[in-house]
């Protein structure tokens, strides 16, 4: 079963927290739709900022949005002007007050979302898919990952019949729930059609639940109006295999 299901959803409540944290009651459907609109808008608006994860928390009158990105300077802007502009734009989606926290991804090579999107953009830029994948695998393993697996599907090299190719290095134990497996599915639009790219990255083993991975650090500028606390690296240990 671990080979079929999304490894992130398979670890929810074990070593991974939810991306939406709130109680909706009778307004659950409206809040869920609002979260979807916020994420869709932010992913389109911040396409060049290498956004990895968007976590939304809600209270009665406040919506707290945590954006994990590899390029926080693009989102924050000079003196925080871009953050203020972003808040005003998001108020058109929700009628509640907005608080935005920016977390920087310290090692983007270990983030499956960023790796998958980088491969997709390179393939769209007419770089050979084998070269893009092998470079991504080499960079990820060099940064300390225990393993990585990349699956690409579609009309590769313009072939008449679609096929799939898998490239992997190291270990990615999908059935081990304490294994910190990051996963993403991205798409690359080429002249011959759409290519699907899936990436699994094993970052070690985790003992104890945490909400945000230690791969994130909060930027100083993002604490404007917020509490500025980051408990992401609390109450867990990482185990490395000695091989």
UniProtKB/Swiss-Prot annotation:
Domain KH type-2: start-end pairs: 38-106
Region of interest (Disordered), residue spans: 217-243
One MF term in the entry's GO annotations: mRNA binding
Subunit composition and interactions: Part of the 30S ribosomal subunit. Forms a tight complex with proteins S10 and S14.
CDD domains on file: KH-II_30S_S3
Protein name, as recorded: Small ribosomal subunit protein uS3
Lineage top rank: taxon: Bacteria
GO cellular component: a single term: cytosolic small ribosomal subunit
PROSITE patterns: KH_TYPE_2, RIBOSOMAL_S3
SUPFAM superfamilies from the UniProt entry: Prokaryotic type KH domain (KH-domain type II) (SSF54814), Ribosomal protein S3 C-terminal domain (SSF54821)
Disulfide bonds: none
PANTHER family reported in the protein's UniProt record: 30S/40S RIBOSOMAL PROTEIN S3 (PTHR11760), SMALL RIBOSOMAL SUBUNIT PROTEIN US3C (PTHR11760:SF19)
An example Gene Ontology biological process: translation
Signal sequence, renumbered to the chain: none
Keywords: Ribonucleoprotein, Ribosomal protein, RNA-binding, rRNA-binding
Family: Belongs to the universal ribosomal protein uS3 family.
Function according to Swiss-Prot or TrEMBL: Binds the lower part of the 30S subunit head. Binds mRNA in the 70S ribosome, positioning it for translation.
Keyword Ribonucleoprotein in annotation: yes
């Amino acid at each position: 079963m671990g080979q079929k299901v999304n490894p992130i959803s398979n670890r929810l409540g074990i070593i991974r927290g939810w991306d939406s944290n709130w109680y909706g009651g009778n307004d659950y459907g409206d809040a869920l739709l609002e979260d979807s609109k916020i994420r869709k808008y932010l992913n389109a608006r911040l396409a060049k900022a290498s956004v990895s994860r968007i976590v939304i928390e809600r209270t009665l009158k406040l919506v707290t949005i945590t954006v994990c990105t590899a390029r926080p300077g693009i989102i924050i802007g000079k003196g925080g002007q871009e953050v203020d502009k972003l808040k005003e734009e998001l108020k058109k989606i929700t009628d509640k007050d907005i608080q935005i926290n920016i977390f920087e991804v310290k090692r983007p090579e270990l983030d499956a979302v960023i790796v998958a999107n980088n491969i997709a953009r390179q393939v769209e830029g007419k770089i050979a898919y084998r070269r893009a994948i092998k470079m991504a695998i080499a960079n990820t393993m060099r940064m300390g990952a225990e393993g990585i697996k990349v699956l690409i599907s579609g009309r590769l090299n313009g072939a008449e019949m679609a096929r799939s190719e898998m490239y992997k290095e190291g270990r990615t134990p999908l059935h081990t729930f304490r294994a910190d497996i990051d996963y993403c599915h991205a798409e690359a639009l080429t002249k011959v059609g759409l290519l699907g790219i899936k990436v699994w990255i094993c970052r070690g083993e985790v003992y104890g639940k945490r909400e945000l991975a230690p791969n994130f650090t909060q930027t100083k500028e993002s604490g404007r109006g917020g509490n500025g606390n980051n408990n992401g690296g609390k109450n867990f240990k990482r185990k490395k295999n000695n091989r």
